[in-house]
């Protein structure tokens, strides 16, 4: 049992603290004032919600080191889409055709 418990162990408070510290360091490196990432998430959600229905409980938007150059920052989003909002898409398409 001890052998398998290493594979299935849950994150503990040490891992949580480490992840929070990484996030703080990444945000500091990106020179973003506190709260800006949350505001960005809200704005992204508002725009996407015009076109698709999003499962907000499983939404994950975070900043992390860019894979090719860890000195750079990437904004990574995992946004589960439940269904498209065809009414808004149709309305937007009609508006674009008029221009």
From Swiss-Prot:
One of its GO terms (cellular component) is plasma membrane. Pfam families: MinE. Gene3D superfamilies: Cell division topological specificity factor MinE (3.30.1070.10). GO terms for biological process: division septum site selection; regulation of division septum assembly. Signal peptide: none annotated. It comes from the Bacteria. The keyword Cell cycle applies. Keywords: Cell cycle, Cell division. SUPFAM superfamilies: Cell division protein MinE topological specificity domain (SSF55229). Belongs to the MinE family. Prevents the cell division inhibition by proteins MinC and MinD at internal division sites while permitting inhibition at polar sites. This ensures cell division at the proper site by restricting the formation of a division septum at the midpoint of the long axis of the cell. This is Cell division topological specificity factor. It comes from Fusobacterium nucleatum subsp. nucleatum (strain ATCC 25586 / DSM 15643 / BCRC 10681 / CIP 101130 / JCM 8532 / KCTC 2640 / LMG 13131 / VPI 4355).
């Amino acid at each position: 049992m001890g052998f398998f418990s290493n594979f299935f162990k849950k994150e503990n408070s040490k891992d949580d603290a480490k992840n929070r510290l990484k996030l703080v360091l990444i945000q500091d490196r990106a020179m973003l004032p506190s709260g800006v990432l949350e505001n960005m998430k809200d704005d992204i959600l508002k725009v996407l919600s015009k076109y698709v229905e999003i499962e907000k409980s499983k939404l994950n938007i975070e900043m992390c080191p860019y894979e090719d150059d860890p000195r750079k920052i990437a904004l990574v989003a995992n946004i589960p889409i439940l269904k498209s909002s065809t009414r808004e898409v149709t309305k937007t398409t009609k508006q674009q055709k008029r221009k």
